Design a protein with these regions (language model features):
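Conserved active-site segments centered on acidic
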Residues: 1-78, 139-142
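Cofactor-cradling patches in redox/metallo enzymes
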Residues: 81
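Phosphate-binding/catalytic loops
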Residues: 84, 88-142
Length: 142
């Protein structure tokens, strides 16, 4: 089982987009049974909240459902459980380092920051970045 975890600030935009896009990709590739995919936040700000409505709309416009998601914060058990943990930007990396000093599992989702659409308002660009990163991850892991 390949275990993938996506991390962003609040777990209501970028990391759930990563989670549900990759779930959709592995399902379409017929390999969903080989993957466990989830997403979390580094902060506690949005705990329990669903996917942010503009992010949900962007995903739905591409046929990707994200129903049932509720934001949660990363835990030590997540770090222990997941083999591949991807953060969306350098701020997330700093939070992760503070929460789990010296942990070596954390990797950048892309070689550049994925801008937070909560601030930019550009959910389409975030969608494109997420798809790019998920395609690369899927290629590397399958």
């Amino acid at each position: 089982m390949i275990k993938v975890l996506f991390v962003c600030h609040g777990n209501i935009c970028r990391s759930p987009m990563g989670e549900f896009v990759l779930k959709d990709m592995v399902k379409k590739a017929g390999i969903a049974d080989q993957f466990e995919i989830a997403s979390v936040a580094v902060s506690r700000e949005e705990l329990g909240n669903p996917v942010y409505p503009p992010a949900r709309r962007e995903m739905h416009s591409h046929g990707v459902a994200c129903d049932g998601h509720h934001a949660r914060q990363i835990t030590r058990s997540d770090v222990d459980k997941f083999d591949h943990i991807y953060y969306m930007d350098s701020s997330n990396a700093r939070y992760l380092e503070r929460l789990f000093p010296g942990e070596q599992k954390f990797r950048a989702f892309l070689p550049r920051n994925v801008a937070d659409p909560w601030y930019t308002g550009d959910f389409t660009q975030t969608w494109l970045d997420i798809c790019e990163g998920c395609e690369k991850i899927l290629e590397e892991l399958k």
